[in-house]
């Protein structure tokens, strides 16, 4: 595409600002996960990928956040979901199972977990890290191979 998806404009503002504003209602603090060669993003708190997780895409960002704040549960939302709504986030929290590794929506395209529209629980860091060290670097595969609460999407 040649352009940072976080900066694409939807809803009259860059997508990253829309997501940030949406998540502020649900989170004590909102972070943007990014590679060390990206940004800075003015006015947004960022977590750079830790060196051991760099070059591992979204999973690198998830693990970096979990490592930096090990007691925090993580609402993970991709920056390229222009149709995500308040209702989407509210439903995720309402149907959340904190005993699981994560709570995630089921993709309407392939019936697999959506790891970038999910709540990843703090207690799962060790098991997620173990799978990463065993060579599993896809967040979707990690959720498939973990105890994940899967929820249906109301409006695919």
What is each stretch, according to the model?
Residues 1-156:
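Nucleotide and nucleotide-moiety/phosphate-recognizing core
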